[in-house]
Amino acid sequence: MKLFQTYYYLRNMTIDLLPLLRCPVTKSPLKLEVISTGKKLYGNQETEIISKAILYAEEDWFYPVVDGIPRLLVESFIDHSSFLKTHLPDYTQRSQILFLKYKDLLQHVIKKNTRTKKSFEHEWRLFDYEKDKTWNADEKQMMERFLKETGETIESLSSKRIFDVGCGNGLLDKLIAAQGATILGMDISNSIEKAFHKNTDPGALFIQGDIQFPPVNSGYFDIVHCSGVLIHTNSTKQSFFCVESCVRENGKLSVWLYHPRKDWIHNMILQVRKFTSKLPLIIQYYLYKLIFLPPLFLIKWLKGQKPQRRELMLALMDQFSPEFRWEHEPEEVKSWFNIKNYGNIKITTRELFGYNMTGIKKQEE
């Protein structure tokens, strides 16, 4: 039996999911207190799910399950204070303990995450699941890209345990699950809600979490895939070291990152970003829509393409809105793989703006 195949099946949740999840701070196992259940359609089968619950660490920390999704950010008890005040009688006392004992940690995560969460939530809110492509790729192209980046095949995915760190709209997770893999998608923003609600494959599972505080058991996954996410955190290197801990021995880590470019247009974009990324999101939205979008749409149209305005807006938001955007030479990233005892390190794809690199985690001697 796959450890967490029936993640949201009520009858198996305590058996299959809880051994995988961990408190992101203490790494202790979590205990579940169910508040209410609901229904979700997987394929043609309506399944009972846990829609509201609270997860308790062995000491101090507690995390809500809201709308069927475990909210496992360090600061989730703040983000979902209204929910917790309603369902946890001693919420005030518990939260005061956390503020007193972990003041510096909480200040750190709030500072580094607040703008990033809002930026990517706003970005993916633009995505139309019925009409839009994901980064100009349809479902077939998305799957082909994933296989090329990871060096896997359709056949090799069967029964694999995969962690998609920064899953965005969640469409790729659904496609991978359809090949017989069990995949856990994690995202830092509330975009995870649409990913979960639009998913119809029971093998694709979703949690909200922070790449620098992964709320899962260490050394568990066959493949950890992190595409275009590390470079949007406050420290690419630190995030790399945090996420690689989730890879099992002989497992694979796959990361996609930006590389430096030496052309004046790219450098101009980076300079513009220094200004736009600091603006309120609502101002950014109209700036891109009214000033940046029309010429970009015209350029695409003159090239014979058929651009969708929402897709172009999403691309503009991804380029100019995130607080952090780092670029790294392949040799630098390769050194991180080496530090963490990975072998068979190779670049699997090279593109205009970035590249994908994979490595196999060696067994400890």
Residues of each region from the PLM?
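Short, glycine-/aromatic-enriched active-site segment of Class I SAM-dependent methyltransferases
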Residues: 263-271, 305-325
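A short glycine-rich, Lys/Arg-flanked "PGG" loop and its adjoining helix->strand segment in the class I
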Residues: 237-249
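Short alpha-helix
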Residues: 324-340
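A short SAM/SAH-binding and catalytic strip from SAM-dependent methyltransferases
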Residues: 222-235
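Conserved Class I S-adenosyl-L-methionine
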Residues: 266-300
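Conserved N-terminal segment of class I S-adenosyl-L-methionine
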Residues: 7-163, 167-216, 223, 325, ...
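A short linear hydrophobic-aromatic micro-motif
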Residues: 343-347
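Conserved beta-strand signature within the Rossmann-like core of class I S-adenosyl-L-methionine
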Residues: 250-258
